[in-house]
Amino acid sequence: AVPAFVDVVALFVNPDPADVQAVLDQVGPELLQFHGDESPQDCARYHHRYLRAFRAGAPGLATAEDLASYCRAYGEAAGWLFDSYSAGYGGSGHGFDHALLSDVKADPVSRPLILSGGLTPDNVAAAVQSVRPWAVDVSSGVEVEQGIKSSDRISFFVAAVHAADAKK
């Protein structure tokens, strides 16, 4: 069972609609999270809260204006997650120029922003102070080796986020 106050999020990359529906029926996640080439219609078809991930710096999303224009179509999303661009899908462990988010943040339809991409205990404070995201997402930045998380690195990461967030 999932503990109280924890949301279940189902992450998909270019899923078959039947697979998404099966997860909705069998798991009942609070949120769907789309990381592929899903259109706004693909994301909204389930009538369920969703997060949309964007790969900042991808072809066609390499300027602040282009990124904001693309994001605008996903105005129904519960939040927008920004990761760095890599040729494949999934986290690359690399950061991106956070200046690309300037137009996104200023857009009237902007959604809660989740920052991802190359975040570590050493750089997350500067990223939080610069971007002021609603949340941060980390994976490889707290690993001691691929797939192995360090409880110390996680603690340092969380402490850095709290310290940066307190400096409003």
Residue ranges of model-derived segments:
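Conserved strand-to-helix beginnings and helix N-cap segments that scaffold or border functional pockets
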Residues: 21, 63-65, 125, 148-151
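Residue-level signal for alpha-helix termini/capping positions
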Residues: 25, 106, 129-132, 162
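Active-site-proximal flexible loops/turns
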Residues: 90, 104, 125, 144, ...
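Conserved active-site loop/cleft motifs that coordinate metal ions or position small ligands
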Residues: 114-116, 135-139
